[in-house]
Regions:
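Short, flexible loop motifs at catalytic/binding sites
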Residues: 1
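Catalytic cores of carbohydrate-active enzymes across secretory and cytosolic contexts
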Residues: 4-9, 14-744
Length: 744
């Protein structure tokens, strides 16, 4: 019998035969032998089964990946829309006769300050703290993270202050003890001769307290940063939320330590208030108030705890800030002396549950509720928020808390000031080096001239420690007018290939800001068309953000010769100040704006503002006269109501100065049905007026001086300004907790 297969065994004499499957059989080893079933051909049901199996494996893989993605995605939060009660905004009425006999201690809590300022928050807190210190009515301290980049700043003089203990929970919920260090340095406040006209006392530096990393992983990696752009980055192993929560709890532990008598144990109840006010800035630091309030409730802050102030710096991003509840629980202290962890956690959650939605806790409302007084950075917007005219995303999370404080007149708007120290067309080294700085005369620039003289005084005395940033010959300006200085800036850009010869006689419109939707970038095409039709030039200078960059860069192609887009940081750093000095107009078409610092800086550089005038912009932008404009009529009525809160001399000035002599901008309504046509008209009116000014240089110079002075009127230390208002608010908060510095 023949066979297709050979079977090895005792009777096999080494016969082998290549099988039809390409292998060999036989040889006594049994290798290469196949059972008869292995040689069957696959039928259709075999292929179907394999296909079903493969499909099942793919489905399982997709399910696994999808589950992982869904687990890491933010929880969907359902917030019911609701109607809020009507509350009339009262505002802050200053008492011009108030005399404070005690210099109070103020501690600002912030993520940014001084050289470690990445955005507007750092600029605002730095300027406010400096102005408060110069007022001499407040002894100012700043508490911030110890970013490693600070070690690279020469001459800063950071010194170790003290180590402090801190408790957190480990991954198993057990108490974990760690130690963190606090360092400090002195921040020299910029000074000018006029600071000593009415008060000869020396202006002492601001003390900056640095909260360092912990001594336990991963908190020993906190606050690592090579430069200012990295201060919000987090190293691997340390979640961003853990870093924020660690900072908040460490700050509270440090403030508790500071508010004690040095002769008393750290854990003893204090009997003397060492800190009068703790001023917390922003939602990322709001939990500081929670930890401090817990210390106050336990008596750990003594019989005289500090007043707690909370400032909201915007009404969009801050409201969205939140932490995972499981992360918050990691940094909670035990509230009861019980071994029942579930009972303890229930009591802890009971305190924060009103602020929890889904698996996240939103901190803004907590900060508002726990503070003795709350501020927003714009008076007009605070009024609109309270009285229901401003609709904003996630308002349901905070508006109830805001109204509770507003009913007690403890939610007030204090409009930010403008700091003229850094970005100043009189004193900036880059402008002085090329003789592009603005001139000083009896109308403007006298204060800056005093500063320049003070800076260069050592050079006249042969002191080797003179200002080496700018040669002594470059001090001051050869220009007799602001107009001629701006023309020189245009020519400087032309000689460096950044403007054309034609641009020297065209009005220059400048946009400065982030490329994001709420900056009104949807109006760029309309603005480009209007600028081109009126013979102008548009420079768009900003940083990429959530608005499609291609939509912006395409404008260069669509409006060749009219529009230039500058989106790289280096070009902006190298040439931005020269574009500011040369610009005739600043375009600010924002849909939302808490204050509008860019617009204020534009006025300081002699640029008329073309803007939407929304939010805080409405407080200092005055539109050209237009009797048919409903907004102007509404503003006039509002001004009549608010005169009662102004000093008498300001009321008289407002009544005596007509709009024709006050306007500094051309406004349009970004929410009107004809918003684009309004913008077109605003640009047309602005350029038409500019062309008229070219034939009347003296009138043009008067107008430029008006623009500059309207910016200078927003200084932090102006009479009745932010410094005076915050001092009055601190007094209100201190009175609320039973302390009055006027009676001391």
């Amino acid at each position: 019998m023949s066979s297709d297969y050979s079977v090895g065994g005792a009777g096999n004499n080494g016969f082998s035969k290549r099988s039809r499957f390409g292998g060999y059989s036989g040889g006594g080893s049994g290798l290469g032998l196949y059972p008869p079933t292995a040689m069957k051909r696959w039928r259709w049901w075999n292929y179907l089964a394999a296909l079903i199996l493969a499909f099942a494996l793919v489905e399982a893989f997709v399910l696994l990946i999808g589950s992982s993605v869904l687990y890491t995605m933010p929880d969907q939060i359902q917030i019911d829309s609701r109607d809020f009660r009507k509350v009339e905004y009262q505002g802050l009425a200053l008492d011009p006769t108030a005399v404070y006999k005690k210099q109070i201690q103020v501690y600002h809590v912030t993520k940014e300050f001084g050289s470690a300022s990445m955005g507007g928050l750092g600029m605002v807190v730095t300027a406010l703290a400096s102005a408060q210190q110069k007022s001499r009515t407040q002894k100012v301290n700043v508490v911030m993270p110890y970013y490693s980049m600070l070690d690279k700043i020469p001459g800063i003089g950071i010194k170790l202050y003290t180590p402090l203990p801190l408790e957190i929970k480990d991954n198993r919920g057990r108490t974990q003890n760690m130690v963190f260090t606090v360092h400090k340095f002195k921040f020299a406040v910029p000074q000018k001769p006029s600071d000593f006209v009415t008060d000869k006392r020396a202006i002492t530096p601001v003390t900056v307290w640095l909260i360092g990393p912990g001594d336990t992983y991963p908190f020993d990696r906190a606050f690592q940063s090579k430069n200012v752009q990295e201060i919000y980055s987090t190293p691997s192993g340390l979640p961003a939320e853990w870093k924020d929560l660690y900072f908040s709890k460490a700050v509270a532990a440090f403030i508790q330590h500071q508010n004690k008598n040095d002769d008393i144990s750290l854990f003893a109840t204090a009997v003397t208030r060492m800190i009068d006010v703790v001023h917390v800035h922003g939602a990322t630091n709001a939990l500081v108030l929670h930890y401090l309030q817990q210390s106050i409730d336990k008596g750990a802050m003594g019989e005289e705890p500090p007043a707690l102030i909370y400032t909201l710096h915007d009404y969009l991003d801050e409201l969205q800030y939140s932490n995972e509840i499981v992360n918050v629980q990691k940094f909670m202290d035990r509230r009861v002396h019980s071994e029942d962890d579930e009972e303890d956690m229930f009591l802890q959650m009971d305190g924060i549950s009103p602020y929890c939605h889904g698996h996240r806790m939103f901190t803004s409302a907590m900060g508002i509720d726990l503070a003795d007084a709350v501020t927003f950075v714009s008076k007009s917007m605070a009024k609109d928020i309270v009285e229901g005219r401003l609709d904003f995303y996630l308002k349901e999370l905070v508006l109830g808390s805001v109204l509770n404080q507003a009913e007690k007149n403890l939610f007030v708007g204090i409009t930010n000031g403008v700091d003229f120290g850094n970005l100043n067309p009189w004193t900036m080294a880059a402008l002085r080096e090329h003789d592009l700085s603005f001139p000083s005369n009896e109308f403007v620039g006298q204060e800056e001239q005093e500063i320049l003289a003070l800076q260069n005084a050592p050079a006249a005395n042969g002191d080797d420690e003179q200002d080496t940033d700018v040669p002594a010959a470059a001090v001051g300006s050869s220009h007799s007018t602001i107009r001629s200085a701006k023309e020189a800036a245009k020519h400087f850009l032309y000689t460096n290939g950044l403007l054309t010869e034609q641009d020297l006689t065209r009005p220059l419109v400048l946009f400065v800001g982030r490329f994001q939707y709420n900056k009104g970038l949807e109006f760029f095409t309309t603005a480009s068309t209007a600028v081109k039709e009126n013979g102008g030039r548009l420079i768009i200078m900003g940083q990429p953000n959530n608005f499609p960059l291609r939509s912006i860069t395409n404008l260069e192609r669509l409006f060749k010769g009219t529009v230039t887009v500058i989106s790289d940081a280096k070009t902006q750093d190298d040439w931005g100040v020269y574009y500011r000095a040369a610009a005739d107009f600043l375009l600010v078409p924002s849909l939302t704006e808490s204050f509008g610092l860019i617009a204020a800086e534009g006025l300081l550089f002699g640029s008329t503002v073309i803007s939407s005038g929304v939010g805080g912009l409405s407080e200092f932008l005055v539109d050209r006269p237009n009797e048919a404009d409903e907004r102007q009529q509404l503003e006039k009525a509002e001004a009549e109501k608010e005169r009662q809160f102004m000093p008498l001399d300001q009321r008289q000035q407002l009544e005596e100065t007509p709009r024709e002599e006050r306007y500094n901008s051309y406004l349009f309504d970004p929410f009107a049905n004809d918003s684009h046509s309004q913008l077109t008209k605003a640009i047309g009116d602005a350029i038409t007026e500019w062309k008229r000014f070219q034939r009347r240089p003296e009138e043009h110079e008067e107008f430029l001086i008006r623009l500059v002075n309207s910016a200078k009127a927003m200084g932090w230390d102006r009479p009745g300004g932010p410094v005076d208002q915050y001092r009055a608010l601190y007094e209100i908060a201190l009175n609320a907790i039973g302390f009055n510095s006027q009676s001391l």
